[in-house]
């Protein structure tokens, strides 16, 4: 199954802004992204909200618990509940992260990195294949933010992503802030990374802010998008063209008007990136 590109700008739907999205007389954004697990429930307010939002906006489902990097495999119960939500919402697409979250019943509640080895590739691809079979749709996988590397890494992250897509037919959700954070933490060139990502597999872009830790940049989603990430986004716009782009804010969430103004910056930066690409 082939997914169709969506050219638009959106926001992550968060509880402080539910009412504004539901009460607005006109659409506020081109699409919304929701955290899948927040709506994988049997009833109640979450399903009322997602049903109402779905009537007004295209919706992307974005998960944090699939754990495609786990040697334990992806849990079938989780996939079946996710499929139930996807069948209800009819989303633009379903995405999660290239990571693992736990092992042998332990849940770290974090997005842990996978080693970039052939052994890990086999695990990841088998888990993606199972997920796509159960969900009956292709997945988008997001590049992680990274704070450690593995001594036995056999390839760069962008090489791993490209091979993963080639083997499974999955797509990419390219997080520009994560690229910048990982590049800063590990000393690689984020623009060379962008240049190596397969153009035809990128369907969505995330934009977010980060914080400076004692030694590393941390992907905190509690700050506005910084100039360094905007500059990288312009380069991405020039390379990948019209793909869905959205801003994530998960902590210190500002008023919705502030995020809508930031989304206007995203539109302007995208246009600047496209102009630069056409002039080159």
UniProtKB/Swiss-Prot annotation:
It comes from the Bacteria. Induction: Induced by potassium chromate (K(2)Cr(2)O(7)) and cadmium chloride (CdCl(2)). Induction by Cr and Cd requires sigF. Probably part of the CCNA_03001 to CCNA_02999 operon. The keyword Phosphoprotein does not apply. Keywords: Stress response. Pfam families: MbnB_TglH_ChrH. This is UPF0276 protein CCNA_03000. Belongs to the UPF0276 family. PANTHER family: UPF0276 PROTEIN HI_1600. SUPFAM superfamilies: Xylose isomerase-like. It comes from Caulobacter vibrioides (strain NA1000 / CB15N). InterPro entries: MbnB/TglH/ChrH, Xyl_isomerase-like_sf.
